[in-house]
Amino acid sequence: MDTNSTTPMSITDMECNPNYSYLVENIKYLLQAAYMVPPAFLYARILYVIWVKHRKVYSRHQFFVIYSMDSIVGFILLLLDIFITRFFVYVPQLCIPASKFFQSHSLLMNIYYPLLNYLHCAQPLIQIFLTLNRMSSVIWPVDHNKVWSKNLSFIVAFVSLSPFLIIWNTIISPKIIIYYFGGFFMLGLKAVEWADISLFLFLVRSVAVIITVASTVIMFLRMSKMKKRMKSSERTLCLACVIHSICFMVPSFFEALANFNEAYGSSWVNFLIQPFAWDVLNVGSPLIMIFVSGQLRHHVLEISIGCCKPKNKPKTITVHTVTAHVSSRNGTSIFR
């Protein structure tokens, strides 16, 4: 669930609402957890494959290094959703004791809320570098790896540190409990009025969308000219990046709608739709990479499917030559 807004929606309940059915709300949670747990497992496997089991293969490819950062972010966001955010929204039987626990242990809220916004800020930055990486691979295929290898350390540092320039107000701001459905979630007020985290994130995502669209158009135009000169593996990663970009634009669209339409942004509809919009990206990302990249799928799942199976080594056929000696005895031919 997205809880970036520092301006809470109109809330009438200042305590847990007992009118929601425990069973119905729990089923809602289980249904959402059911589709979030498998991608979380895939994220963990992808990170294990890239950085442990097949480190020598993937660490030399800058795209996978950058994508591993996206996997870390997506993995943590799913864990927060599964075990904290949606858990306490859709498990109303824990609303009273859990809300009191968080209110009496404010350190947990002071960690959770800035961390959530940090991850949401890092995602568009990673998206920018993913699309730029694929665009440069078709524009400068010869020098592409050399340039990205040289600047990879800077990219990692930039993505890791720059979100703090955006989320600083969420760190120093007081955190509160917002009662929602039969449960609750945690939100931050603004210590500095003009430093609106929703606006900051909207600007970052807007820049990411503009760069993504421009890079994708350039990439497709260049790929159409290269045709068969481009390696199939590079084409595969470009395709994966394009689909990933589409998934990124889905939550970005609804975030923009909430920022430009105040009535929608403060309505319960926004708070209901936005989490599922983010699921398109966080749940879809590992599925896309596993589906599109045959090599990664083979390493992560240790299976091969269809046309993306690793090519088998050609069979060696040994040909033995037999020499026939012919002799004639009394007109009879004898073969040895």
Swiss-Prot record:
Membrane topology of this protein: Multi-pass membrane protein
GO biological process: sensory perception of chemical stimulus
Keywords assigned: Membrane, Transmembrane, Transmembrane helix
GO MF entries: transmembrane signaling receptor activity
GO CC annotations on file: membrane
Membrane-spanning intervals of the chain: 30-50, 64-84, 111-131, 152-172, 200-220, 237-257, 271-291
Record's subcellular location: Membrane
One Pfam family in the UniProt entry: Srg
InterPro entries xrefs: 7TM_GPCR_serpentine_rcpt_Srg, Nematode_SR-like
Domain of life per record: Eukaryota
SUPFAM superfamilies associated with the record: Family A G protein-coupled receptor-like
Family membership noted in the UniProt record: Belongs to the nematode receptor-like protein srg family.
Protein known as: Serpentine receptor class gamma-9
Lineage, broadest ranks: Eukaryota, Metazoa, Ecdysozoa, Nematoda, Chromadorea
Gene: srg-9
